[in-house]
Amino acid sequence: MAFDKSEWVPLTGLGRMVQAGEIKSIDEILSSGKPIKEPEIVDAFLPDLVDEVLDINMVQRMTDSGRRVKFRAVVVVGNRDGYIGFGQGKDAQVGDAIKKAIVSAKINLVKVRRGCGSWECGCSNPHSIPMLVTGDAGSVRVTLRPAPQGIGLVTGDIGKKVLELAGIRDVWAQTQGQTRTTINYAKATFNALKATNMIRLGGME
């Protein structure tokens, strides 16, 4: 269902500024460093955002009243054009865990700096990343290298899903650690993409 800004009642100052039209783009918020605490802020600027459930796990915990079971969902959101978010959520119901993970991913949204950093290509189109970047999560380390146009996403299935939603079409990836742990693999890939904002260069988006 399409987001209707007129029905939204903002709970934060930033949300009220967005609804009043004082903020014109999501980039304005991300570049300011202000934390996004309402997913509706992202919905207002990126209506084409899609979500992908990467993993659902059962988590058990012993309490005084006995064993409690919850589900943990891992989700990425993106618009396939330079924006990506990663989140996780826990709840006794699978559907509610997914909803919480989507909210978490939206409020953790980042802009990915794209470009053509491959010396084999040099086309200046934003099909890859501008430079080598690395991301860590738990025991997993993911290193992304710029690749020439047409190479595709040379990485595992989880990494591909994250990169595709970010709008990256060509990249070489190297992984270390327990990549079978979906949450760490996805988060490390997300953190590597997040690192593209650390350096500003020309010829990229």
Swiss-Prot record:
Gene3D superfamilies: 3.30.160.20, 3.30.230.10
Pfam families in alphabetical order: Ribosomal_S5, Ribosomal_S5_C
GO terms under cellular component: small ribosomal subunit
Gene Ontology molecular functions: rRNA binding; structural constituent of ribosome
Superkingdom: Archaea
InterPro entries noted in UniProt: Ribosomal_Su5_D2-typ_SF, Ribosomal_uS5, Ribosomal_uS5_arc, Ribosomal_uS5_C, Ribosomal_uS5_euk/arc, Ribosomal_uS5_N, Ribosomal_uS5_N_CS, Ribsml_uS5_D2-typ_fold_subgr
Domain S5 DRBM: 49-112
NCBIfam families to which the protein is assigned, alphabetical: PRK04044.1, uS5_euk_arch
Assembly behavior: Part of the 30S ribosomal subunit. Contacts protein S4.
UniProt family annotation: Belongs to the universal ribosomal protein uS5 family.
HAMAP family reported in the protein's UniProt record: Ribosomal_uS5_A
Protein name as catalogued: Small ribosomal subunit protein uS5
Source organism (scientific name): Methanospirillum hungatei JF-1 (strain ATCC 27890 / DSM 864 / NBRC 100397 / JF-1)
Gene behind the chain: rps5
